């Protein structure tokens, strides 16, 4: 029996595909739009750690689907590239002392080698790298279009600054932990700083970003996360006059029906009015409080679970309708970046206001109740009801009626107006780091921004020896005086760089025309391929990359450069592949190499105490990362591909277990060993034809729906049936090789060649069609024997009884001819299997 030499086979076919550019694709106008398919993976950033077995899960899914569609006559574009600018690459460079240019190139080469070893059908001629000049030239060009459209502006603002990373971070890059706000990357401490920043006006597109979600075939959970992040509210903006000041406080509320329950106003610690309106004898306490609260995260300040804090300014505002005096407070739970940065305190009808009023013993005045009467409140009443304690014309009405009347009154008396507000904030676009796209802006002596001319692009990132963060909030580029100062013009350059998200905002468009030096992509090529039909990647990018790229795409659509309103038609989030780790009694996880197994139990080597095996995310510190190189070396790429898809539904999280891949490896060996049987061109038995069409149907339907695990299961069942036959029927084996090929392309190519077909299978075959009429439903093959020797095989319903089986057998022509002049001793019936007639 010849051995399944997967290493040799996989190397052979990977070289064949590379040398013959099997997966290269070019635009063919004769192919109709409905037969074109653009499939995309969220491209990787090339970390020094390389891939672990979780990374290829999404790549394998797109590869299977792309190959399946290719065999079904689709013109498939499936490109790959590297998100190579940004913090991960730069942090690694700082840790190792290797320049990010060098380390990034080395890491990309490592990634490419690992990706190619898995046999993905990428068109490598379209490879892109976001740190290369021919790419970031167009990132800079798109930034200039945003600037010219009034969507990029400079602003001095409070921002999250991470001393460890040495840069400003966007709100979306901050996470809340029990130890306070941290950077999403690295979980480092952050602080608030006032810095000059470039900001992109994503808020101008808030409504469209919200509305157009309805057109997308995305997971509902992702759409809901974007809706919540955008956070649309419809309400009214009310103006409050301040006693002794000409300034006014504007408040946005969705509950104007509660206006008569206002007992105080709260303004955000960031509000510029604070210093102006705070009374002198209150100023010291107020400014101390403001400084303290500015360091807290937005989530920490607004959470219902967190204690509400505030301080009185000593000043008062006037109620816009009753003219009553209302105390003005500064409070942590009001954000300067949301709405107007001020709220009206209605403690009877808002939970946060209720907590605040209770803490500071402020008046609580109910103006809506269920019964229409005063009731004792133990918590805020937030439901609909009847108005109470209100001026006559607003009293004793449904609160919905009060809402309409209040809006009309405020509008008529010019004290307020209807308005839509969003939680979404403009995107902080500056980073005080070296390894990123230089921002193509100059400043004159007055500080006015001047965009570079387009023919001066790319503005190249200068090579520097010291690329470490300055620690002062300035970019390392600010230290290169010859570069910063444009002497012949008297201008200075912008020294901040763009965030990592800039390059990934539009990379799917560059794949369409990666070598174009005159435009970011030819419009005809954009119209040929866009939108992306299937996009697979992690859910962690929901309010970062996915939102940002939708924003940039809409800007390019408005400018006439792209032909679709949305970039990604269908989105799938693959589940996380986890790994086993080990937990001590106190809940602490310990590294895997610190654990020993004895009698199916696990123990800590250090203290010999038993530990519990648990499922955890793969991490270097826990030493539970599984390297795909090791798996491929032991079992082969095809085994790894199939195992990752066989573990469970694509969108579910599942733990990696190397023992589980052994079963998949055996499955591929069974297929390989079919070569040992005679390859017969005879007509196959009726039942195996039925099984073939059954498996074609199942694999077709499941692959179309991305239900890869059940498709693989069906193929395993089929192979077990096929192994029962003495011969390997060509008419069965050939179509099976084709349906196997998206899942195990190397083995399929080898078997395709073995049966005498020309490679590549993916260029010289078509996906087989199943014939429903050939699928036997509810029937079994019954063997007819005389003295234990097979004379015929017939198909009968499973329910056929013993008496009827005997009658059918006796009427069979082949049996009849062998019974002439013979004495029947007995008839043996085994239900659903055989009828054996014993004669003498």
From Swiss-Prot:
InterPro entries: aa-tRNA-synth_I_CS, aa-tRNA-synth_Ia, Leu-tRNA-ligase, Leu_tRNA-synth_edit, M/V/L/I-tRNA-synth_anticd-bd, Methionyl/Leucyl_tRNA_Synth, Rossmann-like_a/b/a_fold, tRNAsynth_Ia_anticodon-bd. Belongs to the class-I aminoacyl-tRNA synthetase family. A motif ('HIGH' region) lies at residues 44-55. Its EC number is 6.1.1.4. GO terms for biological process: leucyl-tRNA aminoacylation. One of its GO terms (molecular function) is aminoacyl-tRNA deacylase activity. ATP binds at residue 620. This is Leucine--tRNA ligase. Gene3D superfamilies: HUPs (3.40.50.620), Isoleucyl-tRNA Synthetase, Domain 1 (1.10.730.10). PROSITE patterns: AA_TRNA_LIGASE_I (PS00178). It is an enzyme of class 6 (ligase). Keywords: Aminoacyl-tRNA synthetase, ATP-binding, Cytoplasm, Ligase, Nucleotide-binding, Protein biosynthesis. Its main location: cytoplasm. It catalyses: tRNA(Leu) + L-leucine + ATP = L-leucyl-tRNA(Leu) + AMP + diphosphate. One of its GO terms (cellular component) is cytosol. It is found in: Cytoplasm. The keyword Ligase applies. A motif ('KMSKS' region) lies at residues 617-621. The keyword Oxidoreductase does not apply.
């Amino acid at each position: 029996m010849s051995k399944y030499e997967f290493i040799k086979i996989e190397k052979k076919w990977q070289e064949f595909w590379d040398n013959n550019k099997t997966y290269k694709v070019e635009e063919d106008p004769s192919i109709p739009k409905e037969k074109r398919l653009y499939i995309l993976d969220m491209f990787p950033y090339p970390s020094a750690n390389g891939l672990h077995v979780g990374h290829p899960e999404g790549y394998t899914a797109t590869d299977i689907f792309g190959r399946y569609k290719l065999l079904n006559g689709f013109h498939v574009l499936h490109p790959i590239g590297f998100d190579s600018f940004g913090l991960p690459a730069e942090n690694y460079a700082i840790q190792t002392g290797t320049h990010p240019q060098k380390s990034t190139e080395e890491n990309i080469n490592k990634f490419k080698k690992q990706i190619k070893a898995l046999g993905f059908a990428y068109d490598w001629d379209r490879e892109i790298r976001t740190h290369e000049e021919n790419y970031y030239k167009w990132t800079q060009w798109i930034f200039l279009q945003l600037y010219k459209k009034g969507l990029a502006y400079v602003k001095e603002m409070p921002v999250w600054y991470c001393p460890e990373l040495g840069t400003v971070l966007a709100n979306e890059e901050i996470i809340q932990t029990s130890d306070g706000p941290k950077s999403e990357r690295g979980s480092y401490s952050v602080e608030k700083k006032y810095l000059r920043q470039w900001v992109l006006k994503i808020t101008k597109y808030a409504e469209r970003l919200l509305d157009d979600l309805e057109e997308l075939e995305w997971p509902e959970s992702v759409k809901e996360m974007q809706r919540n992040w955008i956070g649309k509210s419809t309400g009214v903006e009310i103006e409050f006059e301040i006693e002794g000041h000409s300034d006014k406080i504007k408040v946005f509320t969705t509950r104007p029906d509660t206006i008569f329950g206002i007992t105080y106003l709260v303004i955000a610690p960031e509000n510029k009015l604070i210093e102006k309106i705070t009374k002198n004898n209150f100023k010291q306490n107020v400014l101390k409080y403001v400084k303290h609260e500015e360091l807290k995260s937005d989530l920490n300040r607004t959470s219902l679970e967190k204690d509400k804090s505030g301080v009185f300014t000593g000043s008062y505002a006037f109620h816009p309708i009753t003219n009553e005096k209302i105390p003005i407070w500064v409070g942590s739970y009001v954000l300067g970046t949301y709405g107007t940065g001020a709220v009206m305190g209605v403690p009877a009808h808002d939970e946060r206001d209720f907590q605040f009023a209770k803490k500071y013993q402020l008046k609580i005045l109910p103006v809506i109740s269920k019964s229409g009467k005063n009731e004792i409140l133990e918590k805020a009443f937030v439901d609909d009801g009847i108005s109470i304690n209100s001026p006559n014309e607003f009293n004793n009405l449904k609160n919905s009626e009060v809402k309409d009347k209040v809006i009309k009154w405020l509008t008529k008396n010019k004290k307020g107006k209807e308005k839509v507000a969003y939680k979404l904030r403009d995107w902080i676009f500056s980073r005080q780091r070296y390894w990123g796209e230089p921002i193509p802006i100059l400043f004159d002596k007055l500080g006015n921004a001047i965009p570079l001319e387009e023919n001066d692009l790319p503005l190249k990132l200068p090579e520097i020896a010291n690329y470490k963060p300055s620690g002062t909030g300035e970019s390392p580029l600010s230290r290169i005086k010859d570069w910063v100062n444009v002497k012949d013009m008297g201008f200075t350059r912008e020294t901040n760089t763009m965030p990592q998200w800039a390059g990934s905002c539009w990379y799917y468009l560059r794949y369409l025309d990666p070598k174009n030096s005159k435009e970011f992509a030819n419009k005809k090529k954009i119209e040929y391929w866009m939108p992306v039909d299937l996009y697979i990647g992690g859910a962690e990018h929901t309010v970062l990359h996915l939102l940002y790229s939708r924003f940039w795409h809409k800007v390019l659509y408005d400018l006439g450069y792209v032909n679709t309103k949305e970039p990604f038609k269908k989105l799938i989030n693959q589940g996380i592949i986890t790994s086993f780790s080990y937990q001590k009694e106190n809940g602490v996880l310990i590294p895997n190499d610190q654990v020993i197994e004895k009698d199916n139990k696990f123990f800590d080597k250090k203290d010999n105490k038993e530990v519990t095996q648990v499922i955890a995310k793969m991490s270097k510190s826990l030493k539970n990362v599984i390297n795909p190189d090791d798996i491929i070396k032991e079992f082969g790429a095809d085994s790894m591909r199939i195992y990752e898809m066989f573990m469970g539904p694509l969108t579910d999280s599942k733990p990696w277990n190397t023992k589980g891949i052994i079963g998949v490896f055996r499955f591929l060996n069974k297929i390989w060993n079919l070569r040992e049987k005679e390859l017969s061109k005879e007509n196959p038995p009726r039942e195996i034809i039925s099984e073939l069409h059954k498996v074609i149907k199942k694999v077709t339907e499941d692959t179309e729906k991305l239900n890869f695990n059940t498709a693989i299961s069906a193929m395993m069942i089929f192979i077990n049936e096929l192994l029962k036959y003495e011969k390997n029927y060509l008419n069965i084996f050939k179509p099976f090789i084709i349906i196997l090929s998206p899942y195990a392309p190397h083995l399929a190519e080898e078997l395709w060649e073995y049966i005498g077909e020309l490679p590549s299978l993916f260029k010289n075959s078509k996906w087989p069609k199943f014939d429903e009429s050939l699928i036997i439903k509810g029937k079994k093959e019954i063997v007819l024997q005389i003295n234990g020797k097979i004379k015929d095989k017939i198909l009968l319903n499973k329910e056929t009884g013993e008496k009827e089986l005997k009658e059918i057998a006796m009427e069979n022509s082949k049996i009849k001819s062998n019974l002439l002049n013979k004495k029947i001793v007995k008839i043996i019936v085994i239900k659903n299997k055989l009828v054996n007639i014993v004669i003498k």
